[in-house]
């Protein structure tokens, strides 16, 4: 964020593990247990689910919210289990691409989310949600959603779908500004800055859109927002060339620290008393 934003305490995986004291490996996998949200605080987990997006919002004392579910076979259940999730209060789908909604089918029956928040969603997912007792709720620009002490303002897309002239589903992706006290993080889905006119003000964290693909609008967004940390959910050895070298260059030139799930594993932002803290899974 701006110069008056919270300071950062970067943590290596080793330091994070030492702080948590007890580290458990789940049977059959290499996911470590994620810590609990601080009392009165929250954790934001950018989950390592391969080539796809899944972000877990974990406010203290209320059931968490899952933003996207990653691709089919991305082990979203293992990721949620590593966070000790039993139930979800909601799942938010940013847009109807398989690497964002594929894992949601696995989530619906097991974690019993109350609501599926969406702007555009495949009919079979809406049907599966209703069958599981999850209520689909349409959201769009101007809506504000509270999750415990976390609040998300929906910045994109407009309620009038005709206002989005691009047919690419990415251009309809939900973009949300996540706030907790003075902490501010932009969740972009796959809406590249060149597609969605965004001016959210200073940011602490940017979730980089579309797995770090080339984005001509990114330098302008970075100039307007000055994020201290940029997190890229991306699959190791993916065939798309993500993240693009130009995106990494733009982020570096803006002075943003870069973390990426293919190299760093799950990226956790811990919000409590004192400055936000960052933990990585590797």
Predicted regions and their residues:
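Non-globular, low-confidence helical/coil segments that flank catalytic cores
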Residues: 1-282
């Amino acid at each position: 964020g701006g110069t008056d934003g919270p300071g950062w305490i970067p943590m290596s995986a080793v330091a994070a593990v030492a702080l948590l004291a007890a580290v458990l490996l789940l049977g059959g996998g290499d996911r470590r247990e994620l810590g609990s949200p601080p009392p009165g605080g929250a954790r934001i987990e950018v989950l390592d689910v391969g080539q796809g997006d899944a972000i877990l919002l974990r406010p203290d004392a209320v059931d968490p919210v899952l933003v996207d579910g990653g691709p089919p076979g991305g082990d979203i259940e293992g990721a949620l289990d590593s966070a000790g999730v039993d139930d979800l209060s909601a799942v938010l789908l940013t847009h109807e691409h398989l690497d964002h909604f594929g894992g949601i089918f696995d989530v619906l029956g097991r974690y019993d989310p109350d609501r599926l928040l969406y702007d555009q969603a495949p009919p079979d997912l809406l049907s599966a949600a209703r069958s599981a007792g999850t209520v689909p709720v349409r959201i769009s620009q101007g809506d504000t959603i509270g999750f415990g002490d976390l609040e998300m303002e929906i910045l994109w897309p407009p309620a009038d779908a005709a206002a989005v002239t691009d047919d690419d589903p990415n251009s309809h992706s939900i973009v949300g500004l996540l706030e907790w006290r003075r902490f501010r993080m932009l969740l972009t889905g796959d809406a590249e800055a060149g597609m969605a006119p965004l001016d959210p003000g200073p940011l602490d964290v940017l979730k980089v859109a579309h797995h770090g693909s080339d984005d001509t609008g990114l330098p302008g967004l970075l100039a307007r927002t000055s994020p201290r940390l940029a997190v890229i959910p991306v699959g190791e050895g993916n065939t798309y060339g993500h993240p693009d070298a130009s995106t990494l260059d733009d982020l570096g030139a803006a002075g943003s620290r870069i973390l990426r799930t293919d190299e760093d594993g799950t990226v956790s932002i811990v919000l409590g008393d004192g400055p936000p803290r960052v933990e990585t899974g590797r």
